[in-house]
Amino acid sequence: MSIDISHITKRFPSAGSGKEPFVALDDVSLTIPSGRLTALLGPSGGGKSTLLRIIAGLENADSGAVTIEGTDATHLPAQKRNVGFVFQHYAAFKHMSVAKNVAFGLEIRKRPKAEVKQKVDDLLNLVHLTQFADRLPSQLSGGQRQRMALARALAIEPNVLLLDEPFGALDAKVRKELREWLRRLHDEVHVTTIFVTHDQEEALEVADEIVVINEGRVEQVGTPDQLYDAPANDFVMRFLGPTTEINGVLHRPHDIEVFTHPGIAGSIPARVVRELRVGFEVRLTVELLDAAHEEITVTVTRAHHRSLGLRPDLDVWLAPTHGAVVPVMESVTA
Amino acid sequence: MVRSSPLLRLVLRTVVVGYLVLLVAWPVSLVVTHTFDGGFSALSKAFADPEVTHALQLTAIVALSSVAINLVFGVTISILLVRYEFPGKRLLSALLDVPLSVSPVVVGLALLLVYNPRSGWLGPALADAGVQIIFSTPGMVLATTFVALPLVIREVVPVLEEIGDDQEWAARSLGASSFQTLRRITLPGVKWALVYGVVLALARSLGEYGAVKVVSGNVVGSTQTATLLVDQRYQNFDQPTAYALSFLLAVASVVCIVIVSVLRPKQEA
Protein backbone atom coordinates (compact mmCIF):
# COMPACT_ATOMS: atom_id res chain seq x y z
CA MET A 1 0.00 0.00 0.00
CA SER A 2 1.35 3.40 -0.98
CA ILE A 3 0.75 6.44 -3.08
CA ASP A 4 1.36 5.86 -6.76
CA ILE A 5 1.77 8.75 -9.12
CA SER A 6 1.96 7.73 -12.75
CA HIS A 7 2.70 9.92 -15.73
CA ILE A 8 1.29 13.12 -14.21
CA THR A 9 1.53 16.14 -16.48
CA LYS A 10 0.26 19.61 -15.58
CA ARG A 11 0.47 22.79 -17.62
CA PHE A 12 -0.61 26.27 -16.62
CA PRO A 13 -1.56 28.87 -19.22
CA SER A 14 1.05 31.61 -19.36
CA ALA A 15 0.14 35.20 -18.70
CA GLY A 16 -0.16 36.95 -22.03
CA SER A 17 -1.54 35.33 -25.14
CA GLY A 18 0.49 33.46 -27.68
CA LYS A 19 3.07 32.21 -25.20
CA GLU A 20 3.83 28.56 -24.58
CA PRO A 21 2.00 27.22 -21.51
CA PHE A 22 4.15 26.75 -18.42
CA VAL A 23 4.85 23.07 -17.78
CA ALA A 24 4.64 22.59 -14.01
CA LEU A 25 4.92 18.79 -14.09
CA ASP A 26 6.29 16.85 -17.02
CA ASP A 27 5.29 13.16 -17.06
CA VAL A 28 6.12 12.53 -13.40
CA SER A 29 5.95 8.97 -12.05
CA LEU A 30 6.70 8.23 -8.42
CA THR A 31 5.85 5.78 -5.65
CA ILE A 32 5.69 7.04 -2.09
CA PRO A 33 5.87 4.27 0.51
CA SER A 34 3.31 4.02 3.33
CA GLY A 35 4.04 5.08 6.87
CA ARG A 36 7.12 7.10 5.91
CA LEU A 37 7.93 10.78 6.06
CA THR A 38 8.78 11.87 2.53
CA ALA A 39 10.05 15.29 1.50
CA LEU A 40 9.44 16.83 -1.92
CA LEU A 41 12.49 19.05 -2.24
CA GLY A 42 13.30 21.52 -4.96
CA PRO A 43 13.60 25.16 -5.93
CA SER A 44 10.54 27.44 -6.04
CA GLY A 45 8.46 27.00 -9.16
CA GLY A 46 9.84 23.51 -9.72
CA GLY A 47 6.44 21.85 -9.49
CA LYS A 48 6.61 20.24 -6.06
CA SER A 49 3.65 22.15 -4.59
CA THR A 50 1.62 21.45 -7.71
CA LEU A 51 2.30 17.74 -7.29
CA LEU A 52 1.17 17.92 -3.65
CA ARG A 53 -2.03 19.74 -4.61
CA ILE A 54 -2.74 17.15 -7.30
CA ILE A 55 -2.36 14.34 -4.73
CA ALA A 56 -4.79 16.22 -2.45
CA GLY A 57 -7.28 16.89 -5.25
CA LEU A 58 -6.95 20.66 -4.92
CA GLU A 59 -5.68 20.73 -8.50
CA ASN A 60 -6.41 18.47 -11.46
CA ALA A 61 -3.66 16.96 -13.58
CA ASP A 62 -3.91 17.30 -17.36
CA SER A 63 -3.03 13.62 -17.71
CA GLY A 64 -1.83 10.75 -15.57
CA ALA A 65 -3.23 8.95 -12.53
CA VAL A 66 -3.01 9.13 -8.74
CA THR A 67 -3.60 6.00 -6.65
CA ILE A 68 -3.87 6.40 -2.88
CA GLU A 69 -3.63 3.20 -0.83
CA GLY A 70 -4.86 1.10 -3.72
CA THR A 71 -7.80 3.36 -4.66
CA ASP A 72 -7.74 5.24 -7.94
CA ALA A 73 -8.13 8.83 -6.77
CA THR A 74 -7.51 10.56 -10.10
CA HIS A 75 -11.11 11.75 -10.47
CA LEU A 76 -12.12 11.83 -6.80
CA PRO A 77 -12.95 15.31 -5.49
CA ALA A 78 -10.83 16.57 -2.59
CA GLN A 79 -13.47 15.86 0.06
CA LYS A 80 -13.62 12.14 -0.83
CA ARG A 81 -9.87 11.45 -0.75
CA ASN A 82 -9.47 11.35 3.03
CA VAL A 83 -6.32 13.38 2.80
CA GLY A 84 -5.10 15.75 5.50
CA PHE A 85 -3.70 18.97 4.06
CA VAL A 86 -1.67 21.57 5.93
CA PHE A 87 -1.13 24.94 4.24
CA GLN A 88 1.86 27.24 4.48
CA HIS A 89 -0.31 30.04 5.84
CA TYR A 90 -2.25 27.72 8.19
CA ALA A 91 -5.70 28.28 6.58
CA ALA A 92 -7.14 28.49 10.09
CA PHE A 93 -10.93 28.91 10.20
CA LYS A 94 -10.78 32.39 11.69
CA HIS A 95 -14.30 32.50 13.07
CA MET A 96 -14.00 29.23 14.99
CA SER A 97 -12.23 28.41 18.25
CA VAL A 98 -9.19 26.14 18.19
CA ALA A 99 -11.29 23.20 19.40
CA LYS A 100 -13.93 23.89 16.72
CA ASN A 101 -11.25 24.02 14.05
CA VAL A 102 -9.96 20.60 15.08
CA ALA A 103 -13.51 19.21 15.35
CA PHE A 104 -14.52 20.42 11.86
CA GLY A 105 -13.77 17.25 9.91
CA LEU A 106 -15.44 15.08 12.55
CA GLU A 107 -18.57 17.24 12.67
CA ILE A 108 -18.83 17.10 8.88
CA ARG A 109 -18.70 13.31 9.26
CA LYS A 110 -21.51 13.53 11.85
CA ARG A 111 -19.64 11.62 14.54
CA PRO A 112 -21.33 11.45 17.98
CA LYS A 113 -20.66 14.50 20.18
CA ALA A 114 -18.88 12.55 22.93
CA GLU A 115 -16.55 10.93 20.42
CA VAL A 116 -15.74 14.30 18.82
CA LYS A 117 -14.96 15.86 22.18
CA GLN A 118 -12.73 12.96 23.22
CA LYS A 119 -10.87 13.03 19.92
CA VAL A 120 -10.39 16.80 19.98
CA ASP A 121 -9.06 16.60 23.56
CA ASP A 122 -6.61 13.87 22.57
CA LEU A 123 -5.37 15.77 19.53
CA LEU A 124 -4.99 19.09 21.35
CA ASN A 125 -2.99 17.20 23.94
CA LEU A 126 -0.84 15.70 21.18
CA VAL A 127 -0.04 19.12 19.72
CA HIS A 128 0.29 20.78 23.17
CA LEU A 129 -2.60 23.21 22.69
CA THR A 130 -4.97 21.96 25.40
CA GLN A 131 -5.01 25.25 27.29
CA PHE A 132 -5.78 27.18 24.07
CA ALA A 133 -8.89 25.15 23.13
CA ASP A 134 -11.30 28.08 23.49
CA ARG A 135 -9.11 30.74 21.88
CA LEU A 136 -9.55 32.06 18.38
CA PRO A 137 -6.77 31.38 15.87
CA SER A 138 -5.93 35.10 15.80
CA GLN A 139 -4.89 34.82 19.45
CA LEU A 140 -2.27 32.17 18.68
CA SER A 141 1.31 32.52 17.44
CA GLY A 142 2.26 31.22 14.00
CA GLY A 143 3.77 28.03 15.38
CA GLN A 144 0.68 27.36 17.49
CA ARG A 145 -1.60 27.95 14.52
CA GLN A 146 0.34 25.49 12.43
CA ARG A 147 0.14 22.86 15.20
CA MET A 148 -3.61 23.48 15.33
CA ALA A 149 -3.79 22.98 11.54
CA LEU A 150 -1.91 19.70 11.95
CA ALA A 151 -4.30 18.50 14.65
CA ARG A 152 -7.22 19.47 12.42
CA ALA A 153 -5.79 17.47 9.53
CA LEU A 154 -5.02 14.46 11.75
CA ALA A 155 -8.55 14.44 13.23
CA ILE A 156 -10.05 12.79 10.15
CA GLU A 157 -7.49 9.94 10.41
CA PRO A 158 -6.27 10.62 6.89
CA ASN A 159 -4.71 7.98 4.66
CA VAL A 160 -2.02 10.50 3.93
CA LEU A 161 -0.95 13.77 5.50
CA LEU A 162 0.24 16.46 3.06
CA LEU A 163 2.13 19.54 4.22
CA ASP A 164 2.81 22.41 1.82
CA GLU A 165 5.86 24.34 3.05
CA PRO A 166 4.42 23.96 6.57
CA PHE A 167 7.13 25.96 8.32
CA GLY A 168 7.82 28.46 5.56
CA ALA A 169 6.00 31.35 7.23
CA LEU A 170 7.64 30.90 10.63
CA ASP A 171 10.79 32.49 11.99
CA ALA A 172 14.02 30.47 12.03
CA LYS A 173 13.93 29.38 15.67
CA VAL A 174 10.29 28.24 15.66
CA ARG A 175 10.90 26.52 12.33
CA LYS A 176 13.69 24.44 13.81
CA GLU A 177 11.63 23.52 16.87
CA LEU A 178 8.63 22.56 14.80
CA ARG A 179 10.53 20.31 12.42
CA GLU A 180 12.05 18.36 15.29
CA TRP A 181 8.58 18.15 16.76
CA LEU A 182 7.13 16.95 13.42
CA ARG A 183 9.75 14.21 13.29
CA ARG A 184 8.82 13.02 16.80
CA LEU A 185 5.10 13.32 16.03
CA HIS A 186 5.52 11.16 12.96
CA ASP A 187 7.35 8.53 15.00
CA GLU A 188 4.25 8.43 17.24
CA VAL A 189 1.50 8.60 14.63
CA HIS A 190 3.04 6.80 11.63
CA VAL A 191 0.68 8.30 9.09
CA THR A 192 2.08 8.43 5.55
CA THR A 193 3.33 12.00 5.31
CA ILE A 194 4.55 14.06 2.38
CA PHE A 195 5.88 17.54 2.91
CA VAL A 196 7.04 20.12 0.44
CA THR A 197 10.08 22.23 1.19
CA HIS A 198 12.73 24.24 -0.61
CA ASP A 199 15.03 24.05 2.42
CA GLN A 200 17.51 21.20 1.94
CA GLU A 201 18.51 21.25 5.60
CA GLU A 202 14.88 20.73 6.61
CA ALA A 203 14.52 17.80 4.21
CA LEU A 204 17.80 16.20 5.29
CA GLU A 205 16.92 16.55 8.96
CA VAL A 206 13.30 15.41 8.97
CA ALA A 207 12.63 13.08 6.05
CA ASP A 208 12.97 9.31 5.74
CA GLU A 209 13.05 9.75 2.02
CA ILE A 210 13.62 12.73 -0.26
CA VAL A 211 12.30 13.31 -3.76
CA VAL A 212 14.21 16.06 -5.55
CA ILE A 213 12.01 17.85 -8.08
CA ASN A 214 13.21 20.46 -10.53
CA GLU A 215 11.57 22.01 -13.59
CA GLY A 216 8.66 19.59 -13.45
CA ARG A 217 10.80 16.45 -13.30
CA VAL A 218 12.02 14.10 -10.60
CA GLU A 219 15.81 14.41 -10.40
CA GLN A 220 16.44 11.77 -7.74
CA VAL A 221 14.70 9.71 -5.06
CA GLY A 222 16.55 8.37 -2.06
CA THR A 223 17.33 8.56 1.63
CA PRO A 224 18.99 11.75 2.87
CA ASP A 225 22.34 9.93 3.07
CA GLN A 226 22.05 8.53 -0.44
CA LEU A 227 21.27 11.97 -1.83
CA TYR A 228 24.05 13.68 0.03
CA ASP A 229 26.74 11.08 -0.57
CA ALA A 230 25.76 9.91 -4.02
CA PRO A 231 23.86 12.61 -5.87
CA ALA A 232 22.55 11.43 -9.22
CA ASN A 233 23.64 14.56 -11.01
CA ASP A 234 25.18 17.98 -10.58
CA PHE A 235 21.79 19.61 -9.90
CA VAL A 236 21.14 17.40 -6.86
CA MET A 237 24.73 17.87 -5.70
CA ARG A 238 24.44 21.65 -5.93
CA PHE A 239 20.95 21.80 -4.42
CA LEU A 240 21.77 19.77 -1.31
CA GLY A 241 24.65 21.93 -0.17
CA PRO A 242 27.58 24.14 -1.14
CA THR A 243 29.89 22.85 -3.85
CA THR A 244 33.28 23.60 -5.25
CA GLU A 245 34.52 22.59 -8.68
CA ILE A 246 38.03 21.26 -9.28
CA ASN A 247 38.95 20.22 -12.81
CA GLY A 248 35.28 19.90 -13.78
CA VAL A 249 34.38 17.67 -10.81
CA LEU A 250 32.08 18.87 -8.00
CA HIS A 251 33.17 18.49 -4.40
CA ARG A 252 31.82 19.65 -1.07
CA PRO A 253 34.07 22.49 0.22
CA HIS A 254 34.57 20.53 3.47
CA ASP A 255 35.55 17.39 1.56
CA ILE A 256 38.82 18.91 0.33
CA GLU A 257 41.94 18.46 2.42
CA VAL A 258 44.48 21.27 2.67
CA PHE A 259 48.22 20.56 2.97
CA THR A 260 51.00 23.04 3.48
CA HIS A 261 53.58 20.83 1.77
CA PRO A 262 53.68 19.17 -1.66
CA GLY A 263 54.08 15.47 -2.41
CA ILE A 264 50.60 14.10 -1.65
CA ALA A 265 49.44 11.93 -4.54
CA GLY A 266 46.87 13.72 -6.71
CA SER A 267 47.19 17.04 -4.89
CA ILE A 268 47.12 20.30 -6.78
CA PRO A 269 48.93 23.51 -5.92
CA ALA A 270 46.98 26.59 -4.93
CA ARG A 271 47.36 29.84 -3.01
CA VAL A 272 45.13 31.25 -0.24
CA VAL A 273 43.53 34.53 -1.34
CA ARG A 274 41.05 35.37 1.42
CA GLU A 275 39.68 33.79 4.53
CA LEU A 276 36.37 34.24 6.36
CA ARG A 277 35.72 32.86 9.80
CA VAL A 278 32.07 31.86 10.45
CA GLY A 279 31.59 30.24 13.87
CA PHE A 280 33.35 26.88 13.94
CA GLU A 281 34.48 26.94 10.33
CA VAL A 282 36.82 29.01 8.20
CA ARG A 283 35.93 29.55 4.55
CA LEU A 284 39.06 29.88 2.45
CA THR A 285 39.06 31.36 -1.02
CA VAL A 286 41.99 29.78 -2.83
CA GLU A 287 43.37 30.36 -6.28
CA LEU A 288 44.36 27.27 -8.23
CA LEU A 289 47.86 27.65 -9.63
CA ASP A 290 47.00 26.19 -13.00
CA ALA A 291 46.49 27.84 -16.36
CA ALA A 292 42.98 29.15 -15.56
CA HIS A 293 43.81 30.56 -12.11
CA GLU A 294 40.31 29.74 -10.91
CA GLU A 295 39.19 30.78 -7.45
CA ILE A 296 37.39 28.12 -5.39
CA THR A 297 36.07 27.82 -1.85
CA VAL A 298 37.41 25.33 0.67
CA THR A 299 36.09 24.97 4.22
CA VAL A 300 38.24 23.88 7.15
CA THR A 301 37.57 23.76 10.90
CA ARG A 302 39.03 26.58 12.92
CA ALA A 303 41.31 24.15 14.82
CA HIS A 304 42.69 22.77 11.55
CA HIS A 305 43.12 26.31 10.28
CA ARG A 306 45.14 27.21 13.35
CA SER A 307 47.32 24.10 13.38
CA LEU A 308 48.25 24.56 9.72
CA GLY A 309 48.92 28.26 10.23
CA LEU A 310 46.86 29.17 7.17
CA ARG A 311 46.93 32.80 6.08
CA PRO A 312 46.46 34.79 2.86
CA ASP A 313 49.22 34.40 0.24
CA LEU A 314 50.29 31.04 1.66
CA ASP A 315 50.95 28.29 -0.89
CA VAL A 316 48.92 25.16 -0.21
CA TRP A 317 48.19 21.82 -1.88
CA LEU A 318 44.60 20.52 -2.20
CA ALA A 319 43.34 16.93 -2.42
CA PRO A 320 39.78 15.57 -2.27
CA THR A 321 39.16 13.79 1.05
CA HIS A 322 39.46 10.07 0.80
CA GLY A 323 36.08 8.32 1.25
CA ALA A 324 33.88 11.32 0.59
CA VAL A 325 33.33 10.44 -3.03
CA VAL A 326 30.85 7.62 -3.51
CA PRO A 327 30.14 6.09 -6.90
CA VAL A 328 27.13 7.85 -8.38
CA MET A 329 24.01 5.75 -7.87
CA GLU A 330 21.85 4.78 -10.76
CA SER A 331 20.05 7.82 -12.05
CA VAL A 332 16.29 7.78 -11.42
CA THR A 333 14.23 7.92 -14.58
CA ALA A 334 11.64 10.58 -14.18
CA MET B 1 3.18 59.93 11.70
CA VAL B 2 3.76 63.28 10.13
CA ARG B 3 3.76 66.07 12.69
CA SER B 4 1.76 69.11 11.76
CA SER B 5 1.46 72.43 13.47
CA PRO B 6 -1.49 72.92 15.90
CA LEU B 7 -2.70 75.85 13.83
CA LEU B 8 -2.84 73.82 10.63
CA ARG B 9 -4.72 71.07 12.43
CA LEU B 10 -7.23 73.59 13.79
CA VAL B 11 -7.81 75.05 10.34
CA LEU B 12 -8.23 71.60 8.75
CA ARG B 13 -10.66 70.56 11.45
CA THR B 14 -12.73 73.72 11.06
CA VAL B 15 -12.90 73.31 7.29
CA VAL B 16 -13.99 69.67 7.50
CA VAL B 17 -16.54 70.22 10.24
CA GLY B 18 -17.92 73.33 8.53
CA TYR B 19 -18.21 71.47 5.24
CA LEU B 20 -20.12 68.58 6.83
CA VAL B 21 -22.39 70.90 8.80
CA LEU B 22 -23.35 72.95 5.75
CA LEU B 23 -23.78 69.93 3.50
CA VAL B 24 -25.26 67.26 5.77
CA ALA B 25 -25.95 68.09 9.39
CA TRP B 26 -27.73 71.46 8.95
CA PRO B 27 -30.16 70.43 6.17
CA VAL B 28 -31.03 67.13 7.85
CA SER B 29 -31.56 68.78 11.22
CA LEU B 30 -33.92 71.25 9.53
CA VAL B 31 -36.05 68.33 8.35
CA VAL B 32 -36.19 67.12 11.95
CA THR B 33 -37.09 70.52 13.40
CA HIS B 34 -39.77 71.09 10.74
CA THR B 35 -41.25 67.67 11.46
CA PHE B 36 -41.66 68.57 15.12
CA ASP B 37 -42.78 72.17 14.54
CA GLY B 38 -46.21 71.26 15.89
CA GLY B 39 -45.10 68.62 18.35
CA PHE B 40 -46.10 65.15 17.27
CA SER B 41 -49.12 66.34 15.28
CA ALA B 42 -47.41 66.06 11.87
CA LEU B 43 -46.37 62.48 12.56
CA SER B 44 -49.73 61.39 13.98
CA LYS B 45 -51.57 63.07 11.13
CA ALA B 46 -49.34 61.34 8.62
CA PHE B 47 -49.90 57.94 10.19
CA ALA B 48 -53.66 58.49 10.09
CA ASP B 49 -53.48 59.05 6.33
CA PRO B 50 -54.15 55.74 4.46
CA GLU B 51 -52.12 56.98 1.47
CA VAL B 52 -49.10 57.45 3.73
CA THR B 53 -49.36 54.07 5.44
CA HIS B 54 -49.83 52.41 2.06
CA ALA B 55 -46.78 54.19 0.67
CA LEU B 56 -44.71 53.15 3.69
CA GLN B 57 -45.85 49.53 3.34
CA LEU B 58 -45.07 49.53 -0.35
CA THR B 59 -41.63 51.03 0.30
CA ALA B 60 -40.92 48.33 2.86
CA ILE B 61 -42.05 45.56 0.50
CA VAL B 62 -40.06 46.91 -2.45
CA ALA B 63 -36.93 47.61 -0.39
CA LEU B 64 -36.91 44.27 1.42
CA SER B 65 -37.59 42.29 -1.77
CA SER B 66 -34.84 44.01 -3.68
CA VAL B 67 -32.40 43.60 -0.76
CA ALA B 68 -33.22 39.87 -0.61
CA ILE B 69 -32.63 39.53 -4.36
CA ASN B 70 -29.43 41.55 -4.20
CA LEU B 71 -28.22 39.45 -1.26
CA VAL B 72 -28.62 36.15 -3.10
CA PHE B 73 -27.29 37.35 -6.44
CA GLY B 74 -24.66 39.57 -4.84
CA VAL B 75 -23.08 36.63 -3.01
CA THR B 76 -23.30 34.42 -6.10
CA ILE B 77 -21.76 37.01 -8.42
CA SER B 78 -19.06 37.90 -5.88
CA ILE B 79 -17.98 34.26 -5.55
CA LEU B 80 -18.08 33.88 -9.33
CA LEU B 81 -15.91 36.98 -9.80
CA VAL B 82 -13.32 36.10 -7.17
CA ARG B 83 -13.08 32.31 -7.28
CA TYR B 84 -13.57 31.46 -10.96
CA GLU B 85 -11.89 32.30 -14.22
CA PHE B 86 -14.11 32.64 -17.27
CA PRO B 87 -14.15 34.58 -20.51
CA GLY B 88 -15.86 37.95 -20.17
CA LYS B 89 -15.06 38.25 -16.45
CA ARG B 90 -13.66 41.77 -16.77
CA LEU B 91 -16.65 42.84 -18.85
CA LEU B 92 -19.01 41.50 -16.18
CA SER B 93 -17.06 43.35 -13.50
CA ALA B 94 -17.29 46.58 -15.46
CA LEU B 95 -21.02 46.08 -16.13
CA LEU B 96 -21.64 45.79 -12.40
CA ASP B 97 -20.66 49.42 -11.98
CA VAL B 98 -23.16 50.66 -14.55
CA PRO B 99 -25.97 51.08 -11.98
CA LEU B 100 -23.67 53.36 -9.97
CA SER B 101 -22.75 55.58 -12.89
CA VAL B 102 -26.02 55.71 -14.84
CA SER B 103 -28.76 58.03 -13.67
CA PRO B 104 -31.67 56.14 -12.04
CA VAL B 105 -34.07 57.84 -14.46
CA VAL B 106 -32.20 56.24 -17.34
CA VAL B 107 -32.44 52.88 -15.55
CA GLY B 108 -36.19 53.34 -15.28
CA LEU B 109 -36.52 54.23 -18.96
CA ALA B 110 -34.39 51.25 -19.98
CA LEU B 111 -36.59 48.90 -17.99
CA LEU B 112 -39.64 50.51 -19.56
CA LEU B 113 -38.26 49.74 -23.03
CA VAL B 114 -37.90 46.06 -22.17
CA TYR B 115 -40.97 45.38 -20.03
CA ASN B 116 -43.60 47.84 -21.31
CA PRO B 117 -46.70 45.63 -21.80
CA ARG B 118 -47.65 47.24 -25.15
CA SER B 119 -44.46 48.16 -26.94
CA GLY B 120 -41.71 46.64 -24.81
CA TRP B 121 -39.22 44.06 -25.98
CA LEU B 122 -40.29 41.39 -23.48
CA GLY B 123 -43.37 43.07 -21.98
CA PRO B 124 -46.12 41.91 -24.41
CA ALA B 125 -45.14 38.24 -24.02
CA LEU B 126 -45.17 38.59 -20.23
CA ALA B 127 -48.48 40.50 -20.36
CA ASP B 128 -50.00 37.66 -22.39
CA ALA B 129 -48.88 35.27 -19.69
CA GLY B 130 -50.66 37.45 -17.14
CA VAL B 131 -47.50 38.97 -15.61
CA GLN B 132 -47.51 42.71 -15.22
CA ILE B 133 -44.13 44.25 -14.53
CA ILE B 134 -44.46 47.94 -15.37
CA PHE B 135 -46.84 50.06 -13.23
CA SER B 136 -46.84 47.38 -10.54
CA THR B 137 -44.72 46.10 -7.67
CA PRO B 138 -42.49 43.68 -9.67
CA GLY B 139 -41.28 46.54 -11.87
CA MET B 140 -40.53 48.70 -8.86
CA VAL B 141 -38.62 45.84 -7.20
CA LEU B 142 -36.73 45.34 -10.47
CA ALA B 143 -35.78 49.02 -10.73
CA THR B 144 -34.71 49.21 -7.07
CA THR B 145 -32.72 45.99 -7.36
CA PHE B 146 -30.93 47.33 -10.44
CA VAL B 147 -29.98 50.57 -8.72
CA ALA B 148 -28.68 48.86 -5.55
CA LEU B 149 -27.06 45.97 -7.44
CA PRO B 150 -23.35 46.78 -6.91
CA LEU B 151 -23.55 47.64 -3.22
CA VAL B 152 -23.43 44.10 -1.80
CA ILE B 153 -20.94 42.96 -4.43
CA ARG B 154 -18.52 45.84 -3.87
CA GLU B 155 -18.48 45.10 -0.14
CA VAL B 156 -18.08 41.33 -0.44
CA VAL B 157 -15.56 41.06 -3.31
CA PRO B 158 -12.56 42.65 -1.55
CA VAL B 159 -13.13 40.58 1.59
CA LEU B 160 -13.38 37.37 -0.44
CA GLU B 161 -10.14 38.31 -2.17
CA GLU B 162 -8.44 39.07 1.11
CA ILE B 163 -9.37 35.83 2.90
CA GLY B 164 -8.26 33.75 -0.11
CA ASP B 165 -9.34 30.22 -0.86
CA ASP B 166 -7.05 28.32 1.53
CA GLN B 167 -9.75 28.01 4.19
CA GLU B 168 -12.22 26.72 1.60
CA TRP B 169 -9.74 24.16 0.32
CA ALA B 170 -8.93 23.14 3.88
CA ALA B 171 -12.64 22.54 4.50
CA ARG B 172 -12.94 20.52 1.29
CA SER B 173 -9.97 18.34 2.19
CA LEU B 174 -11.58 17.76 5.60
CA GLY B 175 -14.60 16.29 3.83
CA ALA B 176 -16.96 19.26 3.45
CA SER B 177 -19.12 19.45 0.31
CA SER B 178 -19.20 22.69 -1.65
CA PHE B 179 -22.49 23.67 0.01
CA GLN B 180 -21.13 22.89 3.51
CA THR B 181 -18.01 24.89 2.68
CA LEU B 182 -20.12 27.85 1.57
CA ARG B 183 -22.32 27.74 4.66
CA ARG B 184 -19.69 27.00 7.30
CA ILE B 185 -16.57 28.73 5.93
CA THR B 186 -17.19 31.23 3.12
CA LEU B 187 -20.33 32.95 4.43
CA PRO B 188 -19.08 33.32 8.03
CA GLY B 189 -15.85 34.70 6.58
CA VAL B 190 -17.63 37.49 4.70
CA LYS B 191 -20.35 37.98 7.35
CA TRP B 192 -19.53 41.58 8.20
CA ALA B 193 -19.08 42.61 4.60
CA LEU B 194 -22.49 41.06 3.87
CA VAL B 195 -24.17 42.87 6.77
CA TYR B 196 -22.61 46.13 5.67
CA GLY B 197 -23.54 45.59 2.02
CA VAL B 198 -27.11 44.69 2.95
CA VAL B 199 -27.51 47.78 5.10
CA LEU B 200 -26.14 50.01 2.35
CA ALA B 201 -28.45 48.34 -0.16
CA LEU B 202 -31.39 48.73 2.21
CA ALA B 203 -30.69 52.42 2.77
CA ARG B 204 -30.30 52.94 -0.98
CA SER B 205 -33.49 50.97 -1.73
CA LEU B 206 -35.55 52.89 0.82
CA GLY B 207 -34.50 56.15 -0.75
CA GLU B 208 -34.74 55.24 -4.45
CA TYR B 209 -36.77 57.80 -6.38
CA GLY B 210 -35.97 58.30 -10.06
CA ALA B 211 -36.04 54.76 -11.41
CA VAL B 212 -39.12 53.87 -9.36
CA LYS B 213 -40.95 56.99 -10.51
CA VAL B 214 -40.55 56.04 -14.18
CA VAL B 215 -41.61 52.39 -13.88
CA SER B 216 -44.30 52.74 -11.21
CA GLY B 217 -46.53 55.27 -12.94
CA ASN B 218 -46.81 56.96 -9.51
CA VAL B 219 -50.44 55.93 -8.98
CA VAL B 220 -51.66 57.33 -5.65
CA GLY B 221 -52.60 54.62 -3.14
CA SER B 222 -51.39 51.93 -5.50
CA THR B 223 -47.85 52.25 -6.83
CA GLN B 224 -46.68 55.22 -4.83
CA THR B 225 -43.70 54.67 -2.53
CA ALA B 226 -42.71 56.90 0.37
CA THR B 227 -40.18 58.95 -1.63
CA LEU B 228 -42.69 59.56 -4.43
CA LEU B 229 -45.29 60.60 -1.88
CA VAL B 230 -42.84 63.02 -0.20
CA ASP B 231 -42.34 64.77 -3.51
CA GLN B 232 -46.04 64.87 -4.33
CA ARG B 233 -47.10 66.19 -0.92
CA TYR B 234 -44.38 68.80 -0.99
CA GLN B 235 -45.51 70.00 -4.44
CA ASN B 236 -49.12 70.08 -3.18
CA PHE B 237 -48.25 72.27 -0.18
CA ASP B 238 -48.82 69.49 2.37
CA GLN B 239 -45.39 70.17 3.84
CA PRO B 240 -45.98 68.71 7.33
CA THR B 241 -46.66 65.25 5.86
CA ALA B 242 -43.69 65.60 3.48
CA TYR B 243 -41.42 66.46 6.43
CA ALA B 244 -42.81 63.66 8.58
CA LEU B 245 -42.22 61.09 5.84
CA SER B 246 -38.73 62.46 5.14
CA PHE B 247 -38.00 62.24 8.83
CA LEU B 248 -39.10 58.59 8.93
CA LEU B 249 -36.95 57.73 5.88
CA ALA B 250 -33.93 59.46 7.41
CA VAL B 251 -34.47 57.72 10.76
CA ALA B 252 -34.64 54.33 9.04
CA SER B 253 -31.29 54.97 7.34
CA VAL B 254 -29.63 56.28 10.49
CA VAL B 255 -30.90 53.27 12.47
CA CYS B 256 -29.36 50.96 9.83
CA ILE B 257 -25.97 52.64 10.14
CA VAL B 258 -26.10 52.69 13.94
CA ILE B 259 -26.99 48.98 14.09
CA VAL B 260 -24.02 48.17 11.90
CA SER B 261 -21.53 50.21 13.87
CA VAL B 262 -22.77 48.60 17.10
CA LEU B 263 -22.70 45.08 15.65
CA ARG B 264 -19.40 45.37 13.84
CA PRO B 265 -16.52 44.15 16.04
CA LYS B 266 -14.13 46.90 17.06
CA GLN B 267 -11.08 45.31 15.47
CA GLU B 268 -11.50 42.43 13.08
CA ALA B 269 -8.38 40.28 13.12
Model-derived regions: residue spans:
Chain B
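Periplasmic/extracellular loop-to-transmembrane helix junction in inner-membrane transport proteins
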Residues: 2-10, 31-68, 83-86, 232-240
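Interhelical loop and adjacent transmembrane-helix boundary motif
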Residues: 5-6, 43, 50, 209-258
